[in-house]
Amino acid sequence: TSNKETENVKPDDGGKETEEELQKRLIHLTTVQPVVLFMKGNRESPQCGFSRKSSEALTNAGITYGTFDILSDENVRQGLKVFSDWPTYPQLYLNGELAGGNDIILEMAADGTLKTECEQAIEKWTKAKTERTNKRIESILAQSKDILLFMKGSPNEPKCGFSSKVVNALNETGEEYDTFDILKDDEIRQGMKVYSDWPT
């Protein structure tokens, strides 16, 4: 994962989301990255001392983590208190599970468990994501003809010279084949590199 903030998904209807929609969004926000700190402000500009201390503890431990500015979204700010049964901020989530607030984060930093638990969460999240991606790849392969070309673009509109050359070569064989446009699905694009152990 990157050190970018987690995406701040807004409802399409100007903030009037149902409880069910908010619940789904909270699940998404707490699991979109393995380590997420819900805080006032962001790591560059914390808006309270507790948020600053928690963010610094994660940064000082060398943890890759996302943040979500609860001041930017009142639905999340209020909804997460109920979701987590935790009334204050910041709140640290590891793989969708509440690890604790500022006091717990600082205790974990002091005894060394913050780094360990965050690293374990990252490892578990990455493994689960790889497994999900591999299942998607296997499903795509199972539904395709004997020949499947993962390419940039489509046979009629290849988006790179290499894809164009392979399409021309396949067309010359007269064999039927399917294609998958990797430019439309970055998860598959990156996952195929690992799945096939081939970087390009």
Model-predicted segments: where are they?
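Eukaryotic short linear interaction motifs
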Residues: 44-47, 76-77, 107, 156-159, ...
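Thiol-based oxidoreductase modules, predominantly thioredoxin-like and allied folds used
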Residues: 59, 63-77, 175-189
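Local sequence-structure signature of Cys/Sec-based thiol-disulfide redox active-site neighborhoods
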Residues: 26-64, 138-176
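Eukaryotic intrinsically disordered and solvent-exposed regulatory patches
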Residues: 22-25, 76-80, 133-136, 188-193
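Non-catalytic, surface beta->alpha helical segment in thiol-disulfide oxidoreductase systems
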Residues: 94-123
